[in-house]
Amino acid sequence: MHKFKLLFYILVLYAFIFSNNAFSASKKCTNIKKICNVLDKVVGIKTPMMIASGTIINENLIITNRHVVEDHKQFIIKFNDGKIKKAFPLAHNFPADLALLTLNKEKDIPNELIYSKKIKGFINVVAFDQGRNSNRIYKKGKIISFSDITKYPQGRIHTTANSLPGNSGGVAVDEDGNFVGILASGDGNINEIIPIVLINHILK
């Protein structure tokens, strides 16, 4: 049984790294240019348990969900141009389903993430698509609720923007390509996004 699990893991890892769809950057994006540019800000993440998504904060730092990272010690990261690197978790004690990954084991953490306080128009989820084995912009949707973070620190944005299993850790953006938040969960109809402002609580 152990050998079967090991073989399955190797096959999944091989497909994740060497798929013909690896170089998604070569595919023409037909969306708004500002949203198309976000494709290079998203990565695929391979853990011992799943394939998920992550969002690049700077050249060394990636944010994803805590439920993706769990207690694993390292991860395989696939960039939009097909490059593969290892990443390692950085500890934090802020109570949110967010996790930081570093590409060089150094705590090269910015003091603050600059973000827009206004959300323009509809939003899209940009994440790693397991089926295509490449980054993808999903069908746009509207925000249906947005809690006051000052009163409800764990409040989430609820949206009709489409996503699929394995998109956890991907980023939601508005029509200007501004980060709105990090995808956390959903049921295929209504999805939950962790507001981007909460990332700054982790960076502190």
Q: Which residue stretches match the model-derived regions?
A:
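Bacterial N-terminal signal peptides that target proteins for export
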Residues: 1-9
